[in-house]
Amino acid sequence: MSAPVQCPIHPDVHLIEDHRAGDLVCPACGLVVGDRLVDVGTEWRSFSNERSGNDPSRVGAPENPLLSGGDLSTTIAVGFGGSDSDNSLANAQRKSMNNTDRQMTAAMSLIREMSERIHLPRNIQDSASRIFKDVLESKALRGKNNEAQAAACLYIACRKDGVPRTFKEICAVSRVSKKEIGRCFKIIVRSLETNLEQITSADFMSRFCGNLSLPNSIQAAATRIAKCAVDMDLVAGRTPISIAAAAIYMASQASAEKRSAKEIGDVAGAAEITVRQTYKLLYPKALELFPKDFRFVTPIDALPNS
């Protein structure tokens, strides 16, 4: 019976699958532990009659500018029961491996894994990896948890690319606390002097309404309700997420597509009581908040007051 695949240095750490490189990577130290996912497809091709000016022949993966060597280097890992010479070779190579590259490789795998879980596109992953590279070079987060750093970089990349995710969403696909991610986020923004656009409730409307299977008419009404509430200074001190959730609750309750405060809170990552408390701030001005052309199924005076 074969021994389980695990990092010889951190045997209790859950390994990350790097599908593109075909590797199993230890997120704690960046060690490539196994290669069970290698793509068996053709690695290169060449046709003499192709008209393209570029030579299509290529062996190996393209260079990665985020690594000092330009590409991922192979690290020898030895399972339990390996010979003394194997262990000596692995230890020598691990010691000689660039520490920055080791951290970078592990971080890119973490970022890719988290991104895939919440269906973020490749450009967001690349942006987060570049931010992580800048953080490494700045040494601002030296000694901080590698996964917390990667999660914070992913959060910032989402903000910068106009597809913001909440701290709770990022926390849910990582193995670190929201508090740790938040600390790293603050340090990164300060040290890199990163300018981030202010988040508004409108940034979340499309995704929240889509996840609730609400029609465009409800999304449009909720967007207007939230914007007017902010303009009228009804929701001072409330987060864009809770404002969006409360506006969706109000718009849906006035329509045939009703959704409960709990349903909306679950999608938005807000507590039901938070949705209701924010809604109570909107309710007295409901007549002014709704679009003029909104088709009420439930009139304003019949809406829940909390």
UniProtKB/Swiss-Prot annotation:
Q: Where are the zinc fingers (TFIIB-type)?
A: 3-34
Gene Ontology MF annotations: RNA polymerase II general transcription initiation factor activity; TBP-class protein binding; zinc ion binding
The listed locations are: Nucleus
Q: Which UniProt keywords apply?
A: Metal-binding, Nucleus, Repeat, Transcription, Transcription regulation, Zinc, Zinc-finger
Q: What SUPFAM superfamilies does this protein map onto?
A: Cyclin-like, Zinc beta-ribbon
Q: What happens when the gene is disrupted?
A: RNAi-mediated knockdown causes arrested development at 90-100 cells and inhibits differentiation. The two E cell daughters (E2 cells), which form the endoderm, divide abnormally early, immediately after the MS2 cells. Phosphorylation of the RNA Pol II large subunit C-terminal domain (CTD) is reduced severely in embryos.
Cite the binding residues for Zn(2+). Answer: 7, 10, 26, 29
Q: Where are the sequence repeats?
A: 114-190, 208-284
An example Pfam family from this entry, by short name, is Zn_Ribbon_TF
Its BP terms in the Gene Ontology are:
DNA-templated transcription initiation; RNA polymerase II preinitiation complex assembly; transcriptional start site selection at RNA polymerase II promoter
List every stretch annotated Disordered: 47-66
Q: Which residues form a coiled coil?
A: none
GO CC annotation terms, alphabetical: nucleus; transcription preinitiation complex
Source domain of life: Eukaryota
Q: What is its main location?
A: nucleus
Which family does this protein fall into?
Belongs to the TFIIB family.
**Matching PANTHER family:** TRANSCRIPTION INITIATION FACTOR IIB, TRANSCRIPTION INITIATION FACTOR IIB-RELATED
Function summary: General transcription factor that plays a role in transcription initiation by RNA polymerase II (Pol II). Involved in the pre-initiation complex (PIC) formation and Pol II recruitment at promoter DNA. Essential for early embryonic development.
The protein's name is Transcription initiation factor IIB
> Gene that codes for this?
ttb-1
